[in-house]
Amino acid sequence: MNCCRRVSCWKDNIAEFAALQATREDIIKMRQALQLEERELASSAPGGSESGDMQFHLAIAEATHNSMLVELFRQSWQWRENNPMWLQLHSHLGDTLYRKEWLVDHKQILAALIKKDARAAKLASVAAPGKREAASAGVFQC
């Protein structure tokens, strides 16, 4: 989980920076990603597609208008997809309830970005991984 904490740290900062840079078009992309995430949750079985989740986080990175941060996001997502620990976590968190909670977190992040409230965006982004870590506490025991 240490690696997840490190990734969360820079993702929080990306959300904070995106709040200051996001354009109307960026916000539209984030809304579309959340709509996709909602459709995926409504129509898929546990363990279904998470394309909306990925698109939401990508849209936040793109809203910084910083190509290095976008590339950092893409690389970290790829690492996540290939990480045995993350795959194990997802095999245990097949319940869509967790994904629904994460969607609520995403809506809070988006609300802060719409208001261009960098502090609120960072705080909302910080809260989300804490919930994931709590949910996974029983999965990874040292």
Spans of model-derived segments:
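Conserved amphipathic alpha-helical segments that form helical-bundle/coiled-coil interaction surfaces
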Residues: C3-L87, H106-Q108, A120-R132
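C-terminal-biased regions
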Residues: S91, D95-I114, A118-C142
